[in-house]
């Protein structure tokens, strides 16, 4: 690869990332050879089949959508299939998780002053990650009650759910899962949510 006037040698991950960027390779369609239909979360599969109103078998639905593909006579989940339907996608895709940290105060402290008061990691299929992280974040946010102009007590959340949930959904949907290092981290401070 050229960088300015010099050539630099790329490692395997950098080459693969470049191929994804150039659309020479499709991350979601790649097969996870160690996987099988046994890795499917049946609760999510059942819900999906109800939503699309089909009587097809799980295998037929997954194959038709490109989430289950054959290689050497055996069927394996694609990376998209694992993210959407897998029981434990982070086994195969380490960045497929969301960690929520709640801090005491307005800054992140470490060492003897560490101020993390809640720490939860969610690492199921993307649907369940969103569902469980949403429930947990809601349980950690404050609500404020005040008397409105009509003389009625009104309770409002610390942050509107539609706003922070949209941010979470965007982070999960637009995450580069080909990067095996970092996962999504949500930080809750006394004065903000990151």
Segments predicted by a language model, with ranges:
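Active-site helix-to-loop segments that bind/position phosphate- or nucleotide-bearing substrates
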Residues: 2-179, 186-190
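Glycine-rich/acidic phosphate-handling loop/turn and adjacent ATP-lid/helix
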Residues: 193-194
